[in-house]
Structure formats: structure tokens, C-alpha cells
Amino acid sequence: MTSSMYNYIEQTWQSDEWKKVLRQRLIEWRKSPAVERIDKPTRLNRARAIGYKAKQGFVVVRVRVRRGGLNKPRPNSGRRPKRMGVYGYSPAKGYRWIAEEKAARKFPNLEVLGSYYVGEDGMYKYYEIIMVDPNHPVIKSDPNLKWLQDPANRKRVFRGLTSAGKKARGLLKSRGLKGTVKHKWKKKEKEREQKKRHEATKYYRLQNYDKLPGK
């Protein structure tokens, strides 16, 4: 079976030659603004999988997000420095979701369709966001994208309705609830119920031990 063009693009992305090119690009990206509109996607295979099309109404934005723990405002009331909660604050969001929100604030008339990872250095992570203008005539006439005009899909990135938002909320079907707090709670609850049922029949099983088959 013949491999598609996108398969070769994926292989090129993982090659050592591309890593050298990416290193030079990261130097340029660090000097650029945190949210910058670009002409074409860097990873065409990932952009196509999200729904990108090279036509009017689509906008590609590269966003830079700082890595590591974040800082919070220092509280006025007194407490131990350990309990200040100022340094090393970890938000309950992924970097990709934060990048999508930054792009949506920069371009409030556009809706976020999806995003993907493009690179990282010692200080920042870089993502490319695929955005769509829901009021553009070309988008309105597209049967696969006109759902963005529905009022229920406005500001979808701020309500956790994108892929990155659903992943952080534990709602992706492919991911399920595994690894989330709700999954762990359900697992423990199931174990407690099974243990309770097992303990309830313990004395009955001991009394009828001689009557069990093979004993």
C-alpha cells in the first residue's frame, strides 16, 4: 500500500535533519511576539487532521506559552512563606489550552477550531492554533464548518469545548476517565462495594465450607 503525503511529512518531522532546522526556527520564534499570525501551518498533516483548508476564512496563529510553574499575587495577610502559594503555582489547564485562550483573546472575532504542538525550548512551548471566521461567506457556505455559527459554539475555547479543553476535563472518548480524579473515586468506590459484599458472605462461606464441591 502506498503511503500518503502526510505520512512522509510526519516522518520528516521526526528526522534529525528537521530537528536542526527547528532549532534555528526556535531562535527566531523567541524573538517574535507571543501571539503571531502566520501564513501557512508548519505541520500540514496535523492542521489537515484538525480541519484546516487553504481557503478564505481560515487563520493560523502561532502562540508562545511559558513553561514551568506560574506565579500568583502575593497575599496581604500574614502567613508562613511556605503557605503563601506564590511560587510554583500549577494551573488546572494544559499548555495547549492556555495557548488557545491567548489566541482567542488576541482575535476575538475568530473561533478556535483546534491546535497542535510545534516545538519547545528551555523557556517556552510553541503551539499553532487553527482559527476560523464564522461570519465569512466562504465558511457560511461550507457544510462542514457552518456549525460554528450556532450561538452554542461562541467562545467555545473559554468553555472547554475544544479538544485541549475536553482533554483537561477528562471528556475525550478515546481517553476516557482513566487518570482523572473521578475515575479514581469510582474505582475506589467499586473496590469498597466488592469488599463489603465479600465480607458479608464470609461467614456463610465458612459455615458451608464442607458442602462446597470438591471439598
UniProtKB/Swiss-Prot annotation:
Molecular function terms, GO-annotated = RNA binding; structural constituent of ribosome
Q: Which InterPro entries match?
A: Rbsml_eL15_core_dom_sf, Ribosomal_eL15, Ribosomal_eL15_arc, Ribosomal_eL15_CS, Ribosomal_uL23/eL15/eS24_sf
Alphabetical GO CC annotations of the entry are: cytosolic large ribosomal subunit
Q: Name one Pfam family in it.
A: Ribosomal_L15e
Superkingdom as given in the UniProt entry: Archaea
Q: Where is the composition biased (Basic and acidic residues)?
A: 188-202
Keywords, ordered alphabetically:
Ribonucleoprotein, Ribosomal protein
The record's family statement is: Belongs to the eukaryotic ribosomal protein eL15 family.
Region Disordered: what ranges? 179-215
NCBIfam families found in the cross-reference section: PRK04243.1
Annotated GO biological processes are: cytoplasmic translation
| Name the UniProt record assigns to this protein | Large ribosomal subunit protein eL15
